[in-house]
């Protein structure tokens, strides 16, 4: 009778073992206070988030601003002149960025169905909730989120960060400064500004008669400092740099 045999086995990859990937780390959002901000752990990333720009955003949203800042208030009037807009903290703006980075992979790549469903669940959790964990069946994780898939997922997030750094700071030369994505019920706009990345989430209403999308006045927005993402991205030659290279950018943030 023919029997199964393990006569020939390739030696285990020692390097792979030493990495000791925690696949469940994608389903956990760990936020801890630090000096001047927060530390956030998600996946194999550790983000050091300063409390940068919060005071400035609140000041721009008030009516007591210096004349030089009026241009910024006019450009982003739906944020700074809108009583229905809400400022969120930097770690929540980062969470939205990560959700968009996953959604970008889900929409653009040919992922196997099981893996795609996990990416979808993770992106929806990051974008729509503020909970510290999401329950995904260990069996599902073990089958579809292997160590190789985990690495692909994390590499995709880094690639999205790299894409963000190809943006120019808001300018008067017509060069692209924003990434936009439309999802069910919301539009997310990521704009490169002097201090980093302005993240805004606009609610979208569908008009019953003609099916057109109408942006409602309800919007949340926050600022992620450039340094938060810089340490996790790889700048290529010729990519735009920050404020020191943009003397023409007259925005206040």
From Swiss-Prot:
Bilayer disposition of the protein: Peripheral membrane protein
GO process terms (BP): viral process
Keywords tagged on the record: Host cell membrane, Host membrane, Membrane, Viral matrix protein, Virion
Cell compartment(s), UniProt: Virion membrane; Host cell membrane; Host endomembrane system
Listed GO MF terms: structural constituent of virion
Record-stated family: Belongs to the filoviridae membrane-associated protein VP24 family.
Assembly information from the UniProt record: Monomer or homotetramer (Potential). Interacts with the nucleoprotein.
Protein name, UniProt field: Membrane-associated protein VP24
Originating species: Lake Victoria marburgvirus (strain Ozolin-75)
Lineage, top ranks: Viruses, Riboviria, Orthornavirae, Negarnaviricota, Haploviricotina
Gene expressing this chain: VP24
């Amino acid at each position: 009778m023919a029997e199964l045999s393990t006569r020939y086995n390739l030696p285990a990859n020692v390097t792979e073992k030493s990495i000791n990937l925690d696949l469940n780390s994608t389903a956990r959002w760990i936020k801890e206070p630090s000096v001047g901000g927060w530390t956030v752990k998600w996946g194999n990333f550790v983000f050091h988030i300063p409390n940068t720009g919060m005071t400035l955003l609140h000041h721009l949203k008030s009516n007591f601003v210096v004349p030089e800042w009026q241009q910024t208030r006019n450009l982003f009037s739906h944020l700074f002149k809108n009583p229905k807009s809400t400022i969120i903290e930097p770690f929540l703006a980062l969470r939205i960025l990560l959700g968009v980075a996953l959604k970008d992979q889900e929409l653009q790549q040919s992922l196997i169905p099981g893996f795609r469903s996990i990416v979808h669940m993770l992106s929806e959790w990051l974008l729509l909730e503020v909970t510290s964990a999401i329950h995904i069946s260990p069996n599902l994780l073990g089958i579809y989120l292997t160590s190789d898939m985990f690495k692909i997922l994390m590499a995709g997030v880094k690639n999205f960060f790299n894409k963000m750094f190809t943006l120019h700071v808001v300018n008067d030369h017509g060069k692209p400064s924003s990434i936009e994505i439309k999802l069910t019920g919301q539009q997310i706009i990521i704009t490169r500004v002097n201090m980093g990345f302005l993240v805004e989430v606009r609610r979208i209403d569908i008009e019953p008669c003609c099916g057109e999308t109408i942006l409602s006045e309800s919007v949340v927005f926050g600022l992620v400092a450039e340094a938060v993402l810089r340490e996790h991205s790889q700048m290529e030659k010729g990519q735009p740099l920050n404020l020191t290279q943009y003397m023409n950018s007259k925005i206040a943030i």
